[in-house]
Curated annotation (Swiss-Prot):
This is Minor capsid protein M1249L. GO terms for cellular component: host cell cytoplasm; virion component. Interacts with the minor capsid protein p17 and with the hexon capsid protein p72 capsomers; these interactions form a rigid zipper structure that stabilizes the capsomers. Interacts with host IRF3. Belongs to the asfivirus M1249L family. Together with the penton and the other minor capsid proteins (p17, p49), forms a complicated network immediately below the outer capsid shell, stabilizing the whole capsid. In addition, blocks IFN-beta transactivation mediated by the cGAS-STING pathway and regulates the transcriptional activity of IFN-beta. Mechanistically, suppresses the phosphorylation of host key adapter protein TBK1 and degrades host IRF3 in the cytoplasm.
Amino acid sequence: MEEVITIAQIVHRGTDILSLNNEEIEALVDEIYSTLKGSNDIKNIRLIDFLFSLKDFVNHVRAEQSKLPDLSMPMEAYIRQLLVNPDVVPIVSEKKKELRVRPSTRKEIFLINGTHLAVPAEVPIEIYGLKLRLKTFSPQCFMRMAEIGSFSPETLGYVASGANLTNFIRVFMKCVDQETWKKNGEGVVVTTKENIIQFTHQYIELYKFLRSGGHSWLINRLAEEMVHRKLDRENQGSHISSIIETEEVEPEEENIKRVIFFLKELSTMYSVFPVFTSGYMPLLYDLYRAGYLEVLWNPVEQKFLQHAEQREKEQMILQQVDMKLTEVTTQARQYFKIMEEKIGRVQSDTIREILTMEGKVDDPSSILQEVIKACGKQEAELITTEYLNIKKQWELQEKNACAHLKLVKQLRSGLQYAESLKVLESIRVLYKEKNNTTNWNLCKACGFKLLCPHVDMLIQLQAAEASYDTMRTKLMKFSGINKEKENNQGLIYSYFCKICGEELAHFIQEDRTADVGVIGDLNSKLRIFIWQETMKACTFIHFGKLVDVKQFANIAVNVCLPLIYSIENIKKEEDYDPLTQLYAVIYIYAYILNLIYSSQKNKEFLTITIHGMKADSSLNAYVTFLLEKMTQQYSGIINQLSEITDQWIANNFREAFKKIIHQNGLQGLSVQDDTKVLLTEILLDPLYDYAATVARIDGSIPMHKPRTPKEAEYEFKTVIGRTPAELLSQKEFYDKIYTSKYRPDFTQLARLNDVYFQEESLRVWWGGRDEEKISTLIYLRAYELFLKYLQNAPNFNSELAEFKKYENAYGEQKALLAQQGFYNIFDPNTGKADQRTRLFEYKKLPISTLYDEKGLPHKWTIYVYKAIDSSQKPAEIEVSRKDVIKKIDNHYALADLRCSVCHVLQHEVGQLNIKKVQTALKASLEFNTFYAFYESRCPKGGLHDFQDKKCIKCGLFTYIIYDHLSQPELVHDYYNNYKDQYEKEKMSIHSIQIKKDIAVPPTETQPKPQQKPWTFDYGKIIKTAKILDISPAVVEAIGAMEGRSYADIKEGQGAPPPPTSMDDPRLMAVDSAVRIFLYNYNCLRHISTFNKPPMHIERLVKHLSYEEKEDLEKVLPNVVNEYHTTFKQLRVTDPASALLYSIEFLCISFLTLYEIKEPSWVVNIVREFALTELNTIIQSEKLLSKPGAFNFMIFGEDFVCSGEDSSMDDISAYSSPGLFGEDIIDRLDDPFSIEDVDISLDVLDNLAPQ
């Protein structure tokens, strides 16, 4: 008792614990500890732990007392509101990497959720993160220095979740820049929004309690409680109950007794549940968070104990359930991953669809059951075995620290054969057994699995560059599981190692026959494919300087194509399959990786990297990027191949890189002439074009293009602000400029908005830090010119007003040119293209344009080039398509094409003997029919009995069934021998069919009613013309106005003769007009059924109600009648009458609608519709007539006639030849065309520095 009194004297009533320094507090705790250290009572141990926890807490309060919030601040009231109504919490939204929030209430509150920060709008906060380290009983906080911005604390507290102490957080309410947050904000300790509310609430309550001085009596009463520590729980409970029932007890003393009893109950509960052994501190904060320290004025301690006990039991059960759920979920994910890698994506996608339809996609147990059910026995065993291997591998990685793990990782990730073989030698030293080929090679150091024998053999074969047959033979002995799938290439067999379950590499797939490969046809189309895809890859490659992108793509073709040929025996077919395309892409990206790798190894090579990546990035980083790019860019090709997995692509990519390194070594690119390319880029930049256009409008430079070096230099200096020589003298500017984009042919302005690789501007192409210099100059100069333009605006506006007088005529002329129809038909007699309007009939071409005199189709695969200059030798070169890029330069132009079958020139096909062609085609058809008839059946009876590719009964060779040209004598002999037999069997089959047809009784059919003969009524034409206030000849000329003067049309002069053919374009033109009229009329009748009717129809009925729109179908007549039937008959029998019939029907339909009298509410609608439709048809026809007497010379002579064109015809003079011709389209689509592949301007020669 004396010891207790001493303690009571030290901790006397009224002492403010916040006034004690650290030494005094430690002395107090130590003395209490010395009093209780001899006791074995578990309650005393818990009380000691509580004292230490309380000491730590008070120390933190003392340290932060000056920074605690004022009790009068509105945050307290707001937090209380949140506790009552959590729905007023601000809504968190995330946009990319920016973190923003729009609060629904006050701005004083902020929340932290997961790894996202939620703050009021425009009020970012700063976080100072701290992590917690738990010792035996007393939690100690250690700050992790991650300060962001300035130090301005507002709130402080512990965060508790259940009975587990989690994190200690400081929150600051001062603005911080976004970049700092992105850089340093990762890993900042955060928690859920509920805990933030809870710890803020508990801290305010606790702070109020400590500032009130109530802590002193708590310490005193704890000391007094030690006097009664030997009393049993029942007596103590009775003692407390008697105190509570006494009316004279002071309220403060009553509360003290309740706290004592409450703490005793806590001690008892701690001794029951071991989960509380982490100390009193977590529970202390649980009390404040849940508000249970209201026991000071509301005795509810028993209710709390029951609630806490139940909660801890539930928490323990939930933890066990969560652990099991996590384990099953991980297993389900691994099953899917293994299935995609080993079996393919198709089956895994099917399982996902089944689970989605059944609503079990979130149930891991259902996923596991469905995977096992969908797989066969071998597949299920493969998946289960692989999962157990992965799980075992996880355990090994966690526990095992053997040196062989690092070596195996280096072996499997090696990018060169020599490097992998060297690592393999180091691994073999660790083998527990030598020459093991039936089981895993174990490590003699740790005893765990080291390397599968098939991997050991595979590395050796690759390093020795073994042939396909050798690899297949040696690796097949490891195969124990195979999977057969069928795709668009046929059956594919995937074999897996029976030891480790890993797929044996792709070179043993599709090995059923020796003469059929899986790669498909690799003709010139594949060369074009590689060239095009390499150019596309330039969009993400960063070159250190300007490079020749043609050279880049050509090297890729020369490097990749031979390696692709060597993969398998090549099929000689007309097209290549998706697997071949995928191989090509893999080797293209391996070629790019080799260039990057070479630039890192040899500093003399041009630096090559990936946009957004540093030049010194690791090779693995580049591999990861290229693999991701490959799978994203070519997912369409990959999805066509059901057996292709991500692991398959990664393995082949690694092998392709090894082969390229082994065959070509380090590779580099040459650099283009910086001066020429830089000037080209500047002149073709849209920004430069804008500045130059403004300067021409303003009058600062001439309107025409520069014609002399002096004019070119003057224009360049006006736009840029300095001469080319001055600009190029700044070496630091253009030395670091680079470009990696496939630049489109800007000389074809019609394709500016339709090119695949068009970049934004010069700023994107240059991309270096020096680009701001030239961009700033261009912008400043463009702005100066624009200001000058504003100053001269009045003069310009007067000239513009003068031009406006003729704008309508100019627009009409452009509309005429836009609607002109061109038919580019190659005339073999003249060697030129026919360009005609729609007033012509198609020319009948001879059959020799398609077939030669042997009945074989032409193949125009030989290109005939002639020298542009007559002095050039040789004067003519004939090359195949694949050799164009090698042998042809800009001194030659394409003159003709030659057939590789019959060797005739394309313009000479008209000279072939037509009768021979027809005879050969007839014979070829006869042979095809004959041999198709006897493909299976034998003329001697039954089926063919082939031995050594020859039927032993009739003598038919298998190779002449489909090939009638290689052995013509055998083909004719066999045909002559069995021709009579063929005719007899054919007639016999035909007679049987005739008998079947005769046996069928005829059905009675009603005779078709004869239609009334049609007669032309010219009165309808006159009546229509009168309403429209035009000449009847104009109505009669619908469909036949093209190329005629409108003055002649009105007078009825110069009308073309009546059509004599059903294919006459005038019939199609008038019929189209009628169909358009009927279509729009039906839209008007049934407008209530349209969601989006034509705008001009909707405008007519916008004032009607929905009921009135529905009634239009009832009140408006059907004007179609028998038009389509009658027109079709007349078009065949009498084309001239068909033309007049269509025009008359159009007039009748117009008059029928125009003369409607009732109901009154539709009269105006129908009349306006009829007038609008017919006027539109006639105005469209007028645009096709010849232009009038408008004088285009007011625009200047260059506008009408350019170059050597002396034609006086307005249309032909205005149309520049070759603008839309096939030669332009072919050249743009041909990546091997030499003409203008590189952008070049004549002005470059004038701009060269002097």
